[in-house]
Amino acid sequence: MGSRASTLLRDEEIEEIKKETGFSHSQITRLYSRFTSLDKGENGTLSREDFQRIPELAINPLGDRIINAFFSEGEDQVNFRGFMRTLAHFRPIEDNEKSKDQNGPEPLNSRSNKLHFAFRLYDLDKDDKISRDELLQVLRMMVGVNISDEQLGSIADRTIQEADQDGDCAISFAEFVKVLEKVDVEQKMSIRFLH
């Protein structure tokens, strides 16, 4: 299987993915091997069902939301490039990246892009704001039936009251960023990938 992974990924593809995502050559080849092992249809793409076979996602209360983040609107398959773009949001920021070229595109693992990614997990209807109902749905996914609907409603109301600065009873991206300004998002939204 290891040889299959390395023969199907060309060096120029690896270089393009490195440039776009910041992953190292060895990380890309290792993740490609993982990608091909998940690709049960052996067609070079992953389906939602392929992702649902990953135990860590299957038990994660936000697993479905995370899985959906891998897929473009209306798509039911993701190729390796799209898979890597999404994973790049979770790549830790290295010290040498903090002083990167300011004129280049913002890295996918920047604080801003990590916040946009997290915001989209809550913004279920993609209207660029988190409503009380959306917050309730995500809270319900996270806590299950361990908290009453009344308690969840109280948590959602208090969260929106504290975050909502413009009085529209919803949380905009700017308000979301403000609430999380003291949170180490770079660390909390990072997964260590082996080199």
UniProtKB/Swiss-Prot annotation:
Domain of life: Eukaryota
SUPFAM superfamilies: EF-hand
Membrane topology field: Lipid-anchor
Alphabetized UniProt keyword annotations: Calcium, Cell membrane, Cytoplasm, Cytoskeleton, Endoplasmic reticulum, Lipoprotein, Membrane, Metal-binding, Myristate, Nucleus, Phosphoprotein, Protein kinase inhibitor, Protein transport, Repeat, Transport
Domain EF-hand: 26-61, 66-101, 110-145, 151-186
Post-translational modification as stated in the protein's UniProt record: Phosphorylated.
Annotated GO MF terms: calcium ion binding; calcium-dependent protein binding; kinase binding; microtubule binding; protein kinase inhibitor activity
Subcellular location: Nucleus; Cytoplasm; Cytoplasm, Cytoskeleton; Endomembrane system
Family under the similarity heading: Belongs to the calcineurin regulatory subunit family. CHP subfamily.
Function: Calcium-binding protein involved in different processes such as regulation of vesicular trafficking, plasma membrane Na(+)/H(+) exchanger and gene transcription. Involved in the constitutive exocytic membrane traffic. Mediates the association between microtubules and membrane-bound organelles of the endoplasmic reticulum and Golgi apparatus and is also required for the targeting and fusion of transcytotic vesicles (TCV) with the plasma membrane. Functions as an integral cofactor in cell pH regulation by controlling plasma membrane-type Na(+)/H(+) exchange activity.
Assembly and binders: Monomer.
Protein name (database record): Calcineurin B homologous protein 1
Originating organism: Gallus gallus (Chicken)
High-level lineage: Eukaryota, Metazoa, Chordata, Craniata, Vertebrata
Primary gene name: CHP1
